[in-house]
Amino acid sequence: MQEPREQTLSQVNNPDASDEKPETSSLASNLSMSEEIMTCTDYIPRSSNDYTSQMYSAKPYAHILSVPVSETTYPGQTQYQTLQQSQPYAVYPQATQTYGLPPFASSTNASLIPTSSAIANIPAAAVASISNQDYPTYTILGQNQYQACYPSSSFGVTGQTNSDAETTTLAATTYQTEKPSAMVPAPATQRLPSDSSASPPLSQTTPNKDADDQARKNMTVKNRGKRKADASSSQDSELERVFLWDLDETIIIFHSLLTGSYAQKYGKDPTVVIGSGLTMEEMIFEVADTHLFFNDLEECDQVHVEDVASDDNGQDLSNYSFSTDGFSGSGGSGSHGSSVGVQGGVDWMRKLAFRYRKVREIYDKHKSNVGGLLSPQRKEALQRLRAEIEVLTDSWLGTALKSLLLIQSRKNCANVLITTTQLVPALAKVLLYGLGEIFPIENIYSATKIGKESCFERIVSRFGKKVTYVVIGDGRDEEIAAKQHNMPFWRITNHGDLVSLHQALELDFL
């Protein structure tokens, strides 16, 4: 049994010998292989260190060829039996768990890896050592390795470890499990920022919640105004162009009606024109005095409605009596005997802020329905008066409204009003002429106290220098202020200027 196997190995391991000596090969056909090997006396013995395990195949199957070995290797040497070591191979699967386990133990996709790819997943150090050896049980090794590395409860083990190789599904499951516990104490912590206890009992959170609700109801107008300012500032940051309008003789005809200059310029009946102007003036002061506290605020004029909002403490004004609070806009009352009643004092400024807050509420409520401030008779009278003025002025306001509405329709543009009229009468005038929807109250400025140029500076500081400003007016004040700030100025002197302005806006020149 040993001799035929040695004969086969000799033929495989000596291919060159048969090529170099053909006559010897022919002669060997008549002789037995065992005799040819035994008569070889020229063999020089070599030490066992000259041979590696790669030269000796330990495979039990003779028909599977090993890697060709050196032609100087002979199976008849005595060291052959001592170099065959099979025990290290038998314990190989247990020894490889130290480096075979880490690449696979943390993976949750074990079922997706085929068994035939086990060798590709062995570390580089192990592959280097395997390449120099010829293991007889590669397939068995791969199967044993996967069986040792993938227990049936691999998902549970991986979920409990804090491995960086967690899958997205497992991470999402862990987040959903921990999220409720992380969010539960948050409301109590936010409600009690000044509480010394880290985790207040639930019995303490209920009264504090009621206190928060009450505090929310009594929230100061300063904070409300700040939030409104923040909301408007976010909208202002998106603006690209701001149109600064004058009111009288630009959008509406009012002052020239009172003086009769309009009737003289356009050949109208002075009596009718002046009478219409006086009637409109009467309505303006009626609304200003009755609903907008002009009697109290005439001597306390402001440039903008929010100028005194910082003095408002947010008191509920539902049942507040403005007629009996002792406020005097012309100066302090000597009967108080303290600084709180003096003009500019804390109490006086607070009452002043109350009035401007109420003015804003009334304006916002009636900006699209000024008739709600008037009796039915006065409402009808206002409608007739506006129609008469529109006829007398040849649709001046209607022509200006075309440009105003076109600008308002643009998302990146805004209309801002700067007038030399005091703030409260200007608000009444805007409401009565039906311009409340065009000009929000925060976009209305009075230049009575500080002048047009200073108003322009405030507007530039609000909207920024990156915005393009276009000034539209009829007077020298607007023109000079526009030149000071390098703003283009569009002069309005007649109907043709309004028509040209609308055409320029339609063609996107402005």
From Swiss-Prot:
Q: How is it modified after translation?
A: Ser-203 phosphorylation is required for localization at sites of DNA damage and directing interaction with H2AX.
Catalytic reaction equation(s):
O-phospho-L-tyrosyl-[protein] + H2O = L-tyrosyl-[protein] + phosphate
User: What is the first-listed, main subcellular location in coarse terms?
Assistant: cytoplasm
Where is composition skewed (Low complexity) in this entry?
A: 192-203
Summarize tissue expression. Expressed in branchial arches, CNS and developing eye.
Region of interest called Disordered, as start-end residue ranges on this chain: 1-32, 175-233
State its location(s).
Cytoplasm; Nucleus
GO cellular component entries: cytoplasm; nucleus; transcription regulator complex
Result of changing residue 449 to Q: Abolishes phosphatase activity
Keyword terms, alphabetized = Activator, Chromatin regulator, Cytoplasm, Developmental protein, DNA damage, DNA repair, Hydrolase, Magnesium, Metal-binding, Nucleus, Phosphoprotein, Protein phosphatase, Transcription, Transcription regulation
Supply the EC number(s).
Answer: 3.1.3.48
Pfam families assigned: Hydrolase
Residues that bind Mg(2+):
246, 248, 474
Q: Where is the composition biased (Polar residues)?
A: 7-16
| Effect in UniProt of substituting residue 473 to A | Abolishes phosphatase activity
Annotated consequence of substituting residue 478 to Q: Abolishes phosphatase activity
How is the subunit organization of this protein annotated in UniProt? Answer: Interacts with SIX1 and DACH1, and probably SIX2, SIX4 and SIX5.
The UniProt similarity line reads: Belongs to the HAD-like hydrolase superfamily. EYA family.
Family annotation (PANTHER family): EYES ABSENT (PTHR10190), EYES ABSENT HOMOLOG 3 (PTHR10190:SF5)
- Provide the function of this protein: Tyrosine phosphatase that specifically dephosphorylates 'Tyr-142' of histone H2AX (H2AXY142ph). 'Tyr-142' phosphorylation of histone H2AX plays a central role in DNA repair and acts as a mark that distinguishes between apoptotic and repair responses to genotoxic stress. Promotes efficient DNA repair by dephosphorylating H2AX, promoting the recruitment of DNA repair complexes containing MDC1. Its function as histone phosphatase probably explains its role in transcription regulation during organogenesis. The phosphatase activity has been shown in vitro. Coactivates SIX1.
Q: Which NCBIfam families match?
A: EYA-cons_domain (TIGR01658)
Name assigned to this protein: Protein phosphatase EYA3
Q: What is the lineage of its organism?
A: Eukaryota, Metazoa, Chordata, Craniata, Vertebrata
